[in-house]
Amino acid sequence: ARRQRQMCIRDRMNVLYAGYDNPISISVPGVLGGQVQASIVNGNGTLNRAGNGYIAHPTTIGKDVVIRVTASVGGRTQSMGDYTYRVRQLPDPSPFIEYTEDGTPKRYRGGRGLSKAILMNTPGIVAAIDDGLLNINFRVLGFETVFFDNMGNAVPEVSSGASFSTRQKDMFRRLSRGKRFYISRVRAVGPDGVERLLPTTLEVIVN
């Protein structure tokens, strides 16, 4: 029988992330999905069916994942090839202030004014990878807000979770239009279980 053309397509790009459930689409033209089999053959994680696709869950950063695809064609199992994917750690997320405007969820990313009313009604911050390719939420473990008094002295306030503390909210109330503060030293953990200190500082400009 003529060898079928094979296809193994990462749903986002040719990279898998360690400790994370990466969706993968695998298909062989002319062969029903139920007759296509795939497995990781070099021991770096697991590959399981999920709906019409697969979920790859690598374990080791820097060690490639090799996926072997076979298909049942004419009652015989044929190899469709091995596919190699690089394995990386999930990138750092960015901190946002998440709010709803006219029923539409929005994320404040800094660099423009934010209504003081929205700020006062927002419980805290979120952290996520939101770059058009990935949309992955992280759990915020803590962060710091930094205000500056009239003498230019930094006044830090620390939160031990994702929510603004009472002291932070009190500082918000005192801010006049055009004043700024900074959200920094955000600690977050992703679905890979890796805790990280984010290098990004979010500048908030109060309208």
Regions found by a protein language model. Name each.
Residues 1-9:
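Single conserved hydrophobic/aromatic residue that forms the stacking wall/gate
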Residues 3, 62-75, 81, 178-191:
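Short, aromatic- and glycine-rich surface loops/edge beta-strands on solvent-exposed regions
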Residues 10-17, 84-112:
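Low-complexity, Pro/Ser/Thr- and charge-rich linker/hinge segments at domain boundaries
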Residues 20-24:
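Structural beta-strand segments of beta-rich domains
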Residues 41-52, 151-172:
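Low-complexity "stalk/linker" and mucin-like segments enriched in Ser/Thr/Pro/Ala/Gly
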Residues 53-61, 170-175:
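Extracellular/luminal low-complexity segments enriched in Ser/Thr/Pro
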Residues 75-90, 194-204:
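Edge beta-strands of extracellular beta-sandwich domains
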